[in-house]
Amino acid sequence: MRKILPLRAWLAAGLILGSPFSHAASNLVFCSEGSPAGFDPAQYTTGTDYDATSVTLFNRLVQFERGGTRAIPALAESWDIGDDGKTYTFHLRKGVKFHSTDYFKPTREFNADDVLFTFQRMLDKNHPFRKAYPTEFPYFTDMGLDKNIARVEKLDEHRVKFTLNEVDAAFIQNLAMDVASIQSAEYAGQLLEAGKPQQINQKPIGTGPFILSRYQKDAQIRFKGNKDYWKPEDVKIDNLIFSINTDAAVRAQKLKAGECQITLNPRPADLKALQEAANLKVPSQPGFNLGYIAYNVTHKPFDQLEVRQALDMAVNKQAIIDAVYQGAGQLAVNGMPPTQWSYDETIKDAPFDPAKARELLKKAGVAEGTEITLWAMPVQRPYNPNAKLMAEMIQADWAKIGIKARIVSYEWGEYIKRAHAGEHDAMLFGWTGDNGDPDNWLATLYGCDSINGNNVSKWCDAAYDKLVKAAKRVSDQDKRSELYKQAQHILKEQVPITPIAHSTVYQPMSKSVHGFKISPFSRNAFYGVANQP
């Protein structure tokens, strides 16, 4: 019988990150690209945060099947939908255990109280835990769940009822998203009593396949496999390590050297070498994503349509596709990818026309040499593998029409925080779909409810918003599509964004990794995954 070393013995044996070593089959190192802002997924909106939290440490009532967009039972074994489409009764799974750690020992199993705590904390600003630890839940509010969930009721220990104010065709898909990760009410009570509620974001307790062991910011995160997981066949790794490095070239070298077994977001320039490495495989799939420029319409001169039109048509998008994506990008036209149902193929892009752009700026009264800021992301993403280069190319394009753009960047968590606060003029942003529904694009990124969150253009159009909200209240997909197509036309006409590209997603990994599935939502899930050298 093969003996598995405990983590302490594994470390003591000198098997540390940064030096070549032979991995036991139960250990896996993931070369990650950034540190999570925290470990409470409901507070955040990025894949970096979710990789380290929701898909690793937590479960939801329903969750997406690995590698797909279908919502399947998880902490809820089944659910019933009322005839009016506004009530959902969830039948909870029995025998689910919360993590047991040196800072929390659960005395009971998962039940309805945990569901109530999770959602009431986000719904009620006067909730005792939220008052003790004030925080916002931007994704929850971006989707309008704070307004549409009328109440959450405990029917008994293993049944919970949600009542909505309006029909929401995407409700089950939304509950499968990271923001709906179930927290332990018992643990929250312990933290509240100890006067340390903020530790819910530092020392997480979930029901997920892995348990947090240690975290060193900007260096590594260590998890151990959850031996009490309710689906034990999914835990095939004893020790999961996130080795954090923001440099994609360094991550690629570490992967080739065997210092990690899987990474993400490779630079297009590194793909050929990774594909040719004898010890690696590089699966790929079309990206469910969009990289774009967002114009903050609350800042002058971006409040003028002519200015946004001018900046849009001054960008040489094809040159960016060629230089930044190097064959892995497709020209974007709309505010969501063509793989999303309801995408309107009749919409055409504005022509690249710097001369016309100059005319529009003159018409808008914008002086030659007007200065603005252009924010560039500090991280690589499939939808933007080199934001610095993209920003420099856009800067050069805008200089040709008399606009001086100063490039600004921040650490990723700060970048998102400041963007939500609206400090930018124009910024590079992007999105990978989170639930397979058009609402996740058209409402989350451009809707009025999202202007303090992921709608970083701060654009709120009443006619557009009416269409998007109406589509969410209809169950017939053809009718929803028609409404969403009308909304896409308004979005294109009003130019709160310049769509740049959709990209192919590549996921380089060792040939020893088995069972990993590329997520259409760009999540990196390691349950069901084995490393067998």
Curated annotation (Swiss-Prot):
It is found in: Periplasm. This is Dipeptide-binding protein. Residues 1-24 form the signal peptide. SUPFAM superfamilies: Periplasmic binding protein-like II. PROSITE patterns: SBP_BACTERIAL_5. Belongs to the bacterial solute-binding protein 5 family. It comes from the Bacteria. GO terms for cellular component: ATP-binding cassette (ABC) transporter complex; outer membrane-bounded periplasmic space. One of its GO terms (molecular function) is peptide transmembrane transporter activity. GO terms for biological process: dipeptide transport; protein transport. Binds different dipeptides. Probably bind only L-amino acid containing dipeptides. CDD domains: PBP2_DppA_like (cd08493). InterPro entries: Peptide/Ni-bd, SBP_5, SBP_5_CS, SBP_5_dom. Keywords: Peptide transport, Periplasm, Protein transport, Signal, Transport.
